[in-house]
């Protein structure tokens, strides 16, 4: 996704988004934007792993997002909801729908916007509330709740257990290990606060 995003496409999309449209039209500010964008691109495309890449693509895809969102609100008799973060597109609905029709529509919108993107059908999944649906690293389960899944819960529990065991044996953890554990706990707490609180309470007494 990032490796397909060129500066030319970025400028074309920014030209229809305020206030970038005014910056591009103004001969005194256009060079500043050009220089700023040059710092964002590597070998003509956005590099993977930099903070600016998802931020920039989220901005330039606003016109595309609006067009797709509005079209899917009434698509083949279905009210579908479109969401996207970077290259992760999610289309959801209350009832079953033909996902291949939606995929073809998304492809047609890429062509309409002359976007340098194509759907990756190997990573395209269709699921229902009865199954396990993973979206951006979290799972929407059959109980219609967001969860991080058993494997991650087991890993966090094992990390906390290891920390408690080392603490009780006077074997101090290093700064990096502590920050990693603290980050994982904070992440869990933001998604499953009740589970996180119960887990911490359990090990607090150990």
Give the positions of each predicted feature.
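Right-hand nucleic-acid polymerase module
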Residues: 2-50, 55-74, 78, 96-206
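Short beta-strand
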Residues: 80-84
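Short beta-strand-to-loop capping motifs
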Residues: 91-95
């Amino acid at each position: 996704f990032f490796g397909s995003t060129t500066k030319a496409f970025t400028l074309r999309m920014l030209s229809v988004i305020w206030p970038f449209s005014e910056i591009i039209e103004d001969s005194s500010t256009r060079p500043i934007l050009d220089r700023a964008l040059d710092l964002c691109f590597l070998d003509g495309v956005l590099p993977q792993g930099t903070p600016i890449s998802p931020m920039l693509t989220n901005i330039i895809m606003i016109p595309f997002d609006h067009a797709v969102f509005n079209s899917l609100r009434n698509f083949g008799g279905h009210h579908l909801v479109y969401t996207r973060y970077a290259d992760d597109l999610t289309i959801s609905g209350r009832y079953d729908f033909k996902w291949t029709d939606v995929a073809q529509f998304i492809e047609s919108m890429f062509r309409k916007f002359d976007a340098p993107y194509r759907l990756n059908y190997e990573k395209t999944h269709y699921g229902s509330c009865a199954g396990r649906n993973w979206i951006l690293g979290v799972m929407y389960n059959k109980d219609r709740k967001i969860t991080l899944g058993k494997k991650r819960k087991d890993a966090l529990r094992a990390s906390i257990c290891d920390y408690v065991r080392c603490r009780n044996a006077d074997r101090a953890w290093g700064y990096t290990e502590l920050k990693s554990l603290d980050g994982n706990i904070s992440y869990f707490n933001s998604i499953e606060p009740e589970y996180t609180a119960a887990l911490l309470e359990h090990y607090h007494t150990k």
